[in-house]
């Protein structure tokens, strides 16, 4: 049975209560307050729903993750990185990145980044929890992504690309930055061919929970101002 959250409690049900069909649906309801969002990621779940639906909280099994030392950079991507065609920065325009991620896409109906969700993650950015990666070409924003940094874990949320391989350049730059800062895992949530080509793979929900338990409260040395 699906658990419905109330606004006066930040407690989530155990991850083992998540449904098998649809895979990983853990709870519904509640709100997107900064406190609840932080608690959700610490617990191992994330919000994902369409505009007009109640807030839905997910913890899929398996979970798609990328370990920084398993990053795969193809020869063509490595060549592109060496060419320096794109300029990559961190936290220089979080609102523009999340707006670009929320923009309609040819292959999708609507967007799951609602105005309420946008405002919630912008508040997390103001609190120093959510971060953005900007990829520019000749000063124009052509790619990027955003997510949350907590302890030695980074929780990726969404990315976009308006130029060939722009999001891949941003992602690879982020992974290398996180690795240097002591991060041990990047949560990619759901599988995509795009992420698998970069080295992401599936681990069990239980294994993911172990990483949360051991690394959420460990310090990192990441600097987010470019």
From Swiss-Prot:
One of its GO terms (biological process) is protein catabolic process. One of its GO terms (molecular function) is leucyl-tRNA--protein transferase activity. GO terms for cellular component: cytoplasm. The keyword Phosphoprotein does not apply. Keywords: Acyltransferase, Cytoplasm, Transferase. Its EC number is 2.3.2.6. Functions in the N-end rule pathway of protein degradation where it conjugates Leu, Phe and, less efficiently, Met from aminoacyl-tRNAs to the N-termini of proteins containing an N-terminal arginine or lysine. Belongs to the L/F-transferase family. This is Leucyl/phenylalanyl-tRNA--protein transferase. It comes from Pseudomonas putida (strain W619).
């Amino acid at each position: 049975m699906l658990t419905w959250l109330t606004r006066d409690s930040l407690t989530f049900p155990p991850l083992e209560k998540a449904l098998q069909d649809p895979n990983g649906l853990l709870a519904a309801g509640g709100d997107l307050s900064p406190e609840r969002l932080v608690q959700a990621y610490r617990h191992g779940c994330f919000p994902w729903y369409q505009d007009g639906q109640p807030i839905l909280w997910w913890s899929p099994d398996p979970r798609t993750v990328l370990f920084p030392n398993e990053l795969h950079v193809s020869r063509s991507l490595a060549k592109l990185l060496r060419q320096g065609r794109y300029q990559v920065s961190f936290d220089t325009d979080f609102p523009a990145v999340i707006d670009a991620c929320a923009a309609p896409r040819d292959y999708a109906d609507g967007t799951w980044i609602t105005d309420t969700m946008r405002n919630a993650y912008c508040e997390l950015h103001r609190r120093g929890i959510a971060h953005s990666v900007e990829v520019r070409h000749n000063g124009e924003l052509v790619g990027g992504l955003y997510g949350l940094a907590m302890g030695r874990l980074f929780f990726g949320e969404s990315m976009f690309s308006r130029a060939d391989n722009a999001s891949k350049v941003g992602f690879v730059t982020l992974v290398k930055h996180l690795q240097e800062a002591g991060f041990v895992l990047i949560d990619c949530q759901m599988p995509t061919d795009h992420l698998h080509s970069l080295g992401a793979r599936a681990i069990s929900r239980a294994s993911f929970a172990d990483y949360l338990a051991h690394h959420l409260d460990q310090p990192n040395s990441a600097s987010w101002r470019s």
